[in-house]
């Protein structure tokens, strides 16, 4: 995410009503996205959702069947890929095995027939940017996976494009290296200030570095927002389930109490929970509507004692711990409620004084969350 280190460069990108089919398969279905100048923007979704196809259309490697792609208001469809203001970093590095790090990075500049002095200046600048200044004479087969990807990033940036397109660039790396390189990539973005468009299926990658995210599925953009908006206020059931873990239920609105502009309490009947719950909702849901309700596992509190009633805004359900899972900084509990529904609860470890008594397998527990911690996702019918 941008921290204001560099002046904003890059360009605004406008994608309007873009569609693309391969035979009978609809890869993109009327997709519209606006990306701001200098933004770190992620296209996030499962395999086959259309995110890479959209990136390839922006890059100029594919042509859409319909729609417009514009850089700073100028339609770039019909302009060759090498004439656009963008460069692409691929998952497989695409390095020349017979060339050194220096020559791989310098290659685009040699095609432009720049002077040796200018080439050397830029190569040194960008090898320093990606922390490879001590490896310039090595061949790709002498580099680690992370170092190879740094070479690919430097080569893509050395032409000084307005837009850097990244097609799952870290997916071939191990988890720790992927995490470290992601931090470096975010730092590079902050330093150079151009527009980054990052394709990934990994929600944690997108949430940790993006200014905004477009969540895609089956060729459509389901939601665009900041990481906080996407996680805390998912627009659809798919987004809620794809981004993190959640408890998701079908519900019926049974009552609404609107006592002020910032006080709109809704009562939901949820058969899977065997009763009703309270939720704060600002969209003025109406009684009788069928909706989806979600509460994140980390929002649910788990205790051995029944929590004291706090007005009518605390939702409490009793159950038995069916499967406790310790995962370091937190424990995950799968609680079988009295009516048979399985509820996920994540408890982050603070310290032994704050954690309270240890909760174990087969313990009877109480799961609770406040009305402000749940969320009505979408109205299924009016």
For the regions a protein language model found, what residue spans apply to each?
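ABC ATPase nucleotide-binding domain helices that frame the ATP-binding cleft
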Residues: 52-55, 151
């Amino acid at each position: 995410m941008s921290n204001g280190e560099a002046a904003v460069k890059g360009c605004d990108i406008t994608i309007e009503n873009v569609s693309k089919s391969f035979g009978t398969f609809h890869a993109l279905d009327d997709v519209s996205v606006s990306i701001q100048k200098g933004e770190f923007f992620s296209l996030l979704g499962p395999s086959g959702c259309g995110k890479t196809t959209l990136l390839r259309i922006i890059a100029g490697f594919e042509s859409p069947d319909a729609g417009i792609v514009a850089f700073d208001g100028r339609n770039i469809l019909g302009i060759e890929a090498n004439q656009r203001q963008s460069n692409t970093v691929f998952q497989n590095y695409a390095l020349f095995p017979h060339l050194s790090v220096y020559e791989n990075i310098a290659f685009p500049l040699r095609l432009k027939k720049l002077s040796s002095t200018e080439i050397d200046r830029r190569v040194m600048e960008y090898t320093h940017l990606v922390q490879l200044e001590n490896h310039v004479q090595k061949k790709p087969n002498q580099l680690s996976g992370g170092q190879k990807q740094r070479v690919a990033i430097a080569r893509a940036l050395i032409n000084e494009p307005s837009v850097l397109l990244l097609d799952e660039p870290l997916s071939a790396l191990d988890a720790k290296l992927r995490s470290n390189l992601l931090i470096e990539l975010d730092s590079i973005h902050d330093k150079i200030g151009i527009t980054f468009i990052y394709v990934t299926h990994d929600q944690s990658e997108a949430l940790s570095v993006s200014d905004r995210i477009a969540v895609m599925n089956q060729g459509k953009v389901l939601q665009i927002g900041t990481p906080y908006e996407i996680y805390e206020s998912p627009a659809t059931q798919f987004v809620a389930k794809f981004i993190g873990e959640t408890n998701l239920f079908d519900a019926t609105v049974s009552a609404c109490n609107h006592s002020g502009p910032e006080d709109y309490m809704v009562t939901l009947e949820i058969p899977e929970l065997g009763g009703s719950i309270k939720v704060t909702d600002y969209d003025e849901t109406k009684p009788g509507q069928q909706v989806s309700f979600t509460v994140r596992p980390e929002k649910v509190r788990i205790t051995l004692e029944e929590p004291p009633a706090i007005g009518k805004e605390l939702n409490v359900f009793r159950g038995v711990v069916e499967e406790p899972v310790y995962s370091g900084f937190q424990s995950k509990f799968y609680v079988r409620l009295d009516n048979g529904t399985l509820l996920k609860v994540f408890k982050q470890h603070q310290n032994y004084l704050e954690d309270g008594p240890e909760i174990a397998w087969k313990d009877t527990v109480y799961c609770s969350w406040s009305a402000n911690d749940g969320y009505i996702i979408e109205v299924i019918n009016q």
